[in-house]
Amino acid sequence: MLRILKLSTSSRSVPLTRLWLLQLPCFCSSSSSSSSLLSVPSDDHIVRLILDQKSASGALETFRWASTFPGFIHSRSTYRALFHKLCVFRRFDTVYQLLDEMPDSIGLPPDDAIFVTIIRGFGRARLIKRVISVVDLVSKFGIKPSLKVFNSILDVLVKEDIDIAREFFTRKMMASGIHGDVYTYGILMKGLSLTNRIGDGFKLLQIMKTSGVAPNAVVYNTLLHALCKNGKVGRARSLMSEMKEPNDVTFNILISAYCNEQKLIQSMVLLEKCFSLGFVPDVVTVTKVMEVLCNEGRVSEALEVLERVESKGGKVDVVACNTLVKGYCALGKMRVAQRFFIEMERKGYLPNVETYNLLIAGYCDVGMLDSALDTFNDMKTDAIRWNFATFNTLIRGLSIGGRTDDGLKILEMMQDSDTVHGARIDPYNCVIYGFYKENRWEDALEFLLKMEKLFPRAVDRSFKLISLCEKGGMDDLKTAYDQMIGEGGVPSIIVSHCLIHRYSQHGKIEESLELINDMVTRGYLPRSSTFNAVIIGFCKQDKVMNGIKFVEDMAERGCVPDTESYNPLLEELCVKGDIQKAWLLFSRMVEKSIVPDPSMWSSLMFCLSQKTAIHVNSSLQDIIQS
């Protein structure tokens, strides 16, 4: 058994590593004599010193050292601090030894605070049997375990296994004559909610009511959160109506849940009720409401929500403000976004890198590339460090906007930047797309070749696919492409272009359409030289109407068809003698300011020649007028 109090009181017994402590004012007597006795340290000082130790041995050493002071007797507080450190380092045998010694050392048994500390220590170590055994440990000292001890054990058990916790509640707590309080039921509700046992949660709520324990807001909110997490927001709303005193957390849970389901009306109704009861939702909830409003294009209403929260003393942060900036940018209202940006600074919500990135993206989307570059340069002036998203957004915008050479300059800056670590292929693919869009095929291939040092596997796969598109078999091509995708690779626009042509030539139109959809999803609009191959593929399969619809779809997506887009369709219709559809298609083409080439005139004239002279003259007159 350890003996704490019978250690030598000589200052020479103080460990060398602790001698500096003797110089602390709190440990020195007021006498200037070198032979004066040291004053007795307080419990708080010793507790702090024990808790500051970085090892179990250090904590024990400090504890023993404190015993060397004449007149100092350890208290429950110092023992509790030592138990905490010993539990942190899992010295549980020493904990038991010191517990046995406590009554003799200080004349007092351990109290609830000490037992709770030990329970939590066992819990952190996941020693569930030892956690439960604390009940017997308390009884060993002739003390009846208190409700606080039982609740502490229960709190550990619900995090580990709700079934063990329920069994403990029934067989230990209730069998000992301990009646749970609202905190007890709150712990059980937490365990049931964590395991999504919502039905049992409602049963527990009913047991509380019949037992005369009124559920508080914490109990209700725990069950509400579980309901919302499982998508049962309507049932959560009904449960909320039972609450006599919902609090701000209640509204935060339900408003956020409705926002997650994009149910704007319900979230706004609850927001109004929240305000009317004098509550202000937290900044996370406010941001979610604003985000849903902005997604619906109702940015002005989102601004009103923000201003109401501010006027009621609620907290607003830069993330909430960024939501508005993003909303304005999505609507193309860049001047308003810029004004709000300035207002953010005036109110003390300092813009961060995300704010600037949103503005850059917004300017790029509306074609204001010079403003995007100015914002990029402002970041350096305002001491905002560029990150990968900054570079990637600007390179993408410049490349898509027809300024690939400027995008290349930004790419070079990114390569030299110390804020971007590790090469990522996205901005490089953006540059390739820029070359593709500007019909600079040689530059695109040369750039792809230069990428080999940074992305050897991706470049090797790309050239292999391009080669297979030229002269390989379809099975080999599919295998190589699937392998690239399986490895997480993203094909460049050059690879996609080649694949679309090869698939379309071999009648695999569905595969071609998937590639085009993938391009559009990534923001890369294919040129007519790419999607014309699909149109020819439709015509070969005698699916002219599918081809016509495809052209219309591509035009709606922002792609620009050309003469070669309509030529195979018109020719196929004319061969079939369908003059009405041919003429309608020809008219649509002319309306889009696409000038027909000689072959199209020939096809149309051939088709007309099959009709009567009167019909031919009438149609020719319509063509001339067009």
From Swiss-Prot:
It comes from the Eukaryota. Residues 1-66 form a transit peptide. It is found in: Mitochondrion. Pfam families: PPR (PF01535), PPR_2 (PF13041), PPR_3 (PF13812). The keyword Mitochondrion applies. The keyword Mitochondrion applies. PPR repeats lie at residues 75-109, 111-145, 146-180, 181-215, 216-250, 251-281, 282-316, 317-351, 352-386, 387-421, 424-454, 457-491, 492-526, 527-561, 562-596. Keywords: Mitochondrion, Repeat, Transit peptide. GO terms for cellular component: mitochondrion. Belongs to the PPR family. P subfamily. PANTHER family: PENTATRICOPEPTIDE REPEAT-CONTAINING PROTEIN GUN1, CHLOROPLASTIC (PTHR47936:SF1), PPR_LONG DOMAIN-CONTAINING PROTEIN (PTHR47936). This is Pentatricopeptide repeat-containing protein At2g17525, mitochondrial. It comes from Arabidopsis thaliana (Mouse-ear cress).
